[in-house]
Amino acid sequence: AEVCYSHLGCFSDEKPWAGTSQRPIKSLPSDPKKINTRFLLYTNENQNSYQLITATDIATIKASNFNLNRKTRFIIHGFTDSGENSWLSDMCKNMFQVEKVNCICVDWKGGSKAQYSQASQNIRVVGAEVAYLVQVLSTSLNYAPENVHIIGHSLGAHTAGEAGKRLNGLVGRITGLDPAEPYFQDTPEEVRLDPSDAKFVDVIHTDISPILPSLGFGMSQKVGHMDFFPNGGKDMPGCKTGISCNHHRSIEYYHSSILNPEGFLGYPCASYDEFQESGCFPCPAKGCPKMGHFADQYPGKTNAVEQTFFLNTGASDNFTRWRYKVTVTLSGEKDPSGNINVALLGKNGNSAQYQVFKGTLKPDASYTNSIDVELNVGTIQKVTFLWKRSGISVSKPKMGASRITVQSGKDGTKYNFCSSDIVQENVEQTLSPC
């Protein structure tokens, strides 16, 4: 079967759109009137209330604050969501703090609240509506598609892909925020987001556990030029309950990255395990990309597809973290079992204590680990060492750090600190530069 709509073209329910193992249920997209795609324009001049613009009525665009000399960023929500939800306009507001931009929140709640199998077909109409608006801007107002960036969450990521594909990949950038897995993973490129949909495609994966049995809603498949897997792509810190917490974190990371880009450096790495074992450190000579809003500043961004990056984030607030590699060489009287902790004292502030090692503590041995610190301490001036025993014993041995080496992930700078002190457990020892 096939259904056609005036300015949007025709839609079929033949393969690969339906009747495949990934898409067993055959259905056509709903009527565009029912889906009722709306474009809510926010700009630096109207940050708190939107102007409704319509592709079929160019007068609405000309009468609005849409500025032809600025970039345009579309934000597209996902399943069961709405374009008037606060997270979309909040993202625009963060952008207005760092740039002048046309920020268009795309509302398709008339199509997103259907059953999932139907909603996944409805995005084809929404993608066509977005593409049509970009075409109108291009043909009627001479506005170049490469100035367009489409950000989509969940089903919205594949909606962005559909729009980009219809514009022959001429859109400047697409960002996929945890693209939806069911009905899209392992499907042909024309059905889902893929790197050919824009000049640059970057993706943040936060919920890659399988849909069955874990209810992981996001794709594990790499679908961009650059695919970021914060915290390995699943089980986000601070997400205790609720099936949507991990899936929604991709939005929160992007939102924070607009104002805190340096706190989301992605390390190129083959796997999260390798990253966690202190591999893939420090950043390469050309630097690490910034996950989120400023990923497009990375020099090698489109050198290859499926470039893979890992990082760890915080559990709340702005989620930023700064990664360091720490090596502690111990001195002391005997080898109790316990843990050793280090804090960094820098020009911009002091970090909390981070555990470097837990186990048998042997004098003269060295222990190395990577830590993700909650603030950018700047140039490191001192470090503190603290050890704690596990278990109880009558004797009170003393241990110390004779040397602590700290390396910054961002630029590879190494700092060396020394001391000849030894301290009892729970007593802080300060080390100065050697």
From Swiss-Prot:
It is an enzyme of class 3 (hydrolase). One of its GO terms (biological process) is triglyceride catabolic process. The keyword Disulfide bond applies. It is a peripheral membrane protein. Residues 76-88, 240-244 are annotated as: Required for galactolipase activity. It comes from the Eukaryota. Its main location: secreted. Pancreas. One of its GO terms (molecular function) is calcium ion binding. Its EC number is 3.1.1.26, 3.1.1.3. Residues 322-434 form the PLAT domain. CLPS stimulates triacylglycerol lipase activity. Not inhibited by bile salts. It is found in: Secreted; Zymogen granule membrane; Cell projection, Neuron projection. It catalyses: a triacylglycerol + H2O = a diacylglycerol + a fatty acid + H(+); a 1,2-diacyl-3-O-(beta-D-galactosyl)-sn-glycerol + 2 H2O = 3-beta-D-galactosyl-sn-glycerol + 2 a fatty acid + 2 H(+); 1,2,3-tri-(9Z-octadecenoyl)-glycerol + H2O = di-(9Z)-octadecenoylglycerol + (9Z)-octadecenoate + H(+); di-(9Z)-octadecenoylglycerol + H2O = (9Z-octadecenoyl)-glycerol + (9Z)-octadecenoate + H(+). Pfam families: Lipase (PF00151), PLAT (PF01477). The active site is at 154 (nucleophile), 178 (charge relay system), 247 (charge relay system). GO terms for cellular component: extracellular space; neuron projection; zymogen granule membrane. Ca(2+) binds at residues 189, 192, 194, 197. Signal peptide: none annotated. Pathway: Glycerolipid metabolism; triacylglycerol degradation; Glycolipid metabolism. Disulfide bonds join 4-10, 92-103, 239-245, 269-280, 283-288, 418-434. Lipase that primarily hydrolyzes triglycerides and galactosylglycerides. In neonates, may play a major role in pancreatic digestion of dietary fats such as milk fat globules enriched in long-chain triglycerides. Hydrolyzes short-, medium- and long-chain fatty acyls in triglycerides without apparent positional specificity. Can completely deacylate triacylglycerols. When the liver matures and bile salt synthesis increases, likely functions mainly as a galactolipase and monoacylglycerol lipase. Belongs to the AB hydrolase superfamily. Lipase family. This is Pancreatic lipase-related protein 2.
